[in-house]
């Protein structure tokens, strides 16, 4: 595997979970798959926390995951949790597409991520900001591979 070189590239962790869009508005929150299916009933704890965000509305892109004892996302554990096995499902948010009625999709990614980080609680066990690193892609890939991450 190779990664782009240079200091202008953003590098993020790849999580092994379900990518979902969380929509918040009018005191409600919903979860949708990439294909538009409403999976809100599958992520009640994520949506309960999303309802508490101090926004009029937001559309947040991220990954629903179960983190194992080693701190790695575990897809099988997530599938088991969705079938009723006891586990905490976390949501790693990595992009903010809409905020308080404003479409942010034409804004630079770093600006969107800054706004996203500002609306997420600093210490929340379920809603988490997915951080990024600017540049040093080869070094980061090497470290991720050494740690058994994707």
Task: Locate the predicted segments by residue.
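Catalytic cores of nucleic-acid ligases and guanylyltransferases
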Residues: 1-150
């Amino acid at each position: 595997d190779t990664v782009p070189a240079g200091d202008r590239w953003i590098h993020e962790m790849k999580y092994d979970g379900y990518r979902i869009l969380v929509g918040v508005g009018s005191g409600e929150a919903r979860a949708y798959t990439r294909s538009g299916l409403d999976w809100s009933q599958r992520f009640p704890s994520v949506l309960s926390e999303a309802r508490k965000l101090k926004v009029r509305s937001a559309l947040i892109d991220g990954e629903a995951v179960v983190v194992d004892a080693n701190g790695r996302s575990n897809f099988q554990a997530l599938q088991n949790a969705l079938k009723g096995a006891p586990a905490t499902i976390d949501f790693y948010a990595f992009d903010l597409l809409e905020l308080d009625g404003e479409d942010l999709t034409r804004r630079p990614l770093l600006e969107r991520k800054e706004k996203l980080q500002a609306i997420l609680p600093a210490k929340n066990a379920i809603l988490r900001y997915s951080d990024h690193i600017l540049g040093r892609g080869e070094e980061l890939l090497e470290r991720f591979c050494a740690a058994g991450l994707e």
